[in-house]
Amino acid sequence: MSTERRASSNPMTNEENAMFLDILHEAPLFGHRKSRSLVGSYLYMLLLAGYAILAAGAPWMFHRVQQLTPSLLCCCDVALLVVTGVFQQYFVYQVQKIRLQGYYSFSQKLKHVVRLPFAIAAYGTAAMLLVIVWRPQIHILSISSLQRIIMLVEAVGAGFFMGLYIGYVHQYNSVNSRPDVLKSLYSPLQPSSSMEGLRYYEGRLSDQQTALLQYQRENLHFLSEEILCLQEKLSKYEQSDDGSTPQVDLAHLLAARDQELRTLSAEMNQLQSELRLARSLIAERDAEVQRVNSTNNQYIEENERLRAILSEWSMRAANLERALEVERMSNSELQKEVASTRRKQMLETTTSEQP
């Protein structure tokens, strides 16, 4: 029966739906949404990195006071707990700012994440206390080793959740959607099934309505400031129009606008002169490039001509080498013939001289 009553109350005209849906386009704070700073998160991450380095290098850092190493590590752990508590208050303040900006889902995600580093530090401090109390009965590892392990686990766990926080805040800074808290204004007015209608009876609806009221209060505060500023300006201009006060503000405003216009015109003239100078320099560079290209073409033609001459002289040298080789061969043949004729003459003279 309750489902039927809800179903009978759901049908609405398009005009009535649009009356509530138009609220999405009437969020003044959306155009003035401020990004959340991550400087504190990065500082806390650097602190955790230094804490992890201290835990890893404690035997070398405290080698001169080894008997005081457990006490010093406990002091460092307590200091981390205190600093984490301070940073947690800062992170909770940032999450509240995100909630007041109308981003309910981001604030719900971050609300649980920002408290986990302090919880991890508190659990680590409790574990450190148990190690100190049960020191006589612990024989597996040394006390300093157990303390260093606890410190490393604290640093890694807190760093992991702080990385999640940084990722969510970075996503919030880069998001460009409307505030999701406004959905609670019109979502119950839309037709829904019986199972979907049950979600409005959860405790989350009251939290969403509270966030919506806070967001609307911020919108009203912002609009009040804008209205006061506009009323102040209007009163100044009305007084100047009545003649009760001179139009000093208007004249000052016009003079300021005139000065800005002159400044802009001077900057524009300077930019135009610089542009003309740049164009002249570009023209000179183009002419120089053309001259270099023409000179390069001449060098290429001269190189081609020299290559042709070199090839011609190479052919001539080859012909001369061949002719020289032929001449050498003919000369060697002549020398052989001369030698043979001399031997014949010597033989003839020797035969003629014999009786």
Curated annotation (Swiss-Prot):
TM segment ranges: 42-62, 72-92, 113-133, 149-169
Membrane topology reported for the UniProt record: Multi-pass membrane protein
Assembly: Interacts with FRI.
Keyword Flavoprotein in annotation: no
Family: Belongs to the TMEM192 family.
UniProt subcellular location: Membrane
Effect of inactivating the gene: No visible phenotype under normal growth conditions.
Keyword Membrane carried by entry: yes
Region spans: Disordered: 331-355
Coiled-coil intervals: 220-337
Alphabetic keyword roster: Coiled coil, Membrane, Transmembrane, Transmembrane helix
Taxonomic source organism: Arabidopsis thaliana
Domain of life, source organism: Eukaryota
InterPro entries from the UniProt entry: TMEM192 (IPR029399)
Name the record gives this protein: Protein FIP1
Biased composition (Basic and acidic residues): 331-340
GO CC term, one of those recorded: membrane
